[in-house]
Amino acid sequence: NQSAWQGVKNYGTKNNLVEGNKGYNYFVPKDPQDYQATINKVLDNDFSTIIGVGYTLKPNIVKAAKNNPKKNFVLIDTHADKIQNLASISFKNQEGAYLAGVAAAYTTKSHTVGLILGQNSKEMDSFKAGFIQGVTASSRKLHKHIKVMSKTVGNFSDINKAHDIAQEMYNQKADIIFQAAGKSGQGVFKAAKEVNQTNPVGQKVWVIGSDEDQTKLGNYQAKGGQPSNFTLTSVIKSADVAVEDLANQTAKGNFPGGKNLNYGLKNKGISLVQGNLSYHTWIKVQKAKQKIIDGKIKIMANR
């Protein structure tokens, strides 16, 4: 959400638009039951282009697009139906997740890693597929068997449940967990912090963040008081790049209605930060990234 909003702000600033109901604005539903009321509020303010972030908004945005044919609608993180005033922006989550799998495989000492997803969906499947393929391909090169544990929280806002799942994985010898669970993911960081605060800095467990650079969430004090960080790396989804691209197209009269714009490593919609990765591991990640861009590594979006 923050990244998409940044893209809107970037476009607005460059085109002398004012933040507010006469230029560009940001509306946040309290929960899924509030989606329709929030969309109605946006429609009342007479914006010409309305962007919905997250695949759970799809039914409401599709309905609004059909009922308001003179307005442009955009869905982020899912494929839209072929409606002339509705475009969609999707991301090759499997590409970033594959790189996270490479990073995890080359970093793990316990040969056990975990994956925690928000809920069961096609979009979440792409994270799982990419991560497992990245770990598997790297483990073959390392001539090691690396176990991948995978669990789903059930939603994107249950911090306590995600914490308990992560705690269980760490107890079962996982030393790295990749979380793609939205707000629920905060629980994974909480569990890692609890483990790490009781251990010397050299015996830490790690978290791989998603959507944005989550380095700050990994700050902690190790046993003995030494400040450290346990965010291994983060898979970045650059919705800001995609939204600004779309806004520029729309301003030129080329709104891509009925189309899906797909962003991955090649067009800078997905990336992975170096974070706390060793130089050796970072080089392995960069080589895998280039092979994906060149089409030499093919990643399935589901398993």
Language-model regions, residue ranges each:
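A residue-level marker of the well-folded mature domains of exported/periplasmic proteins
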Residues: 1-303
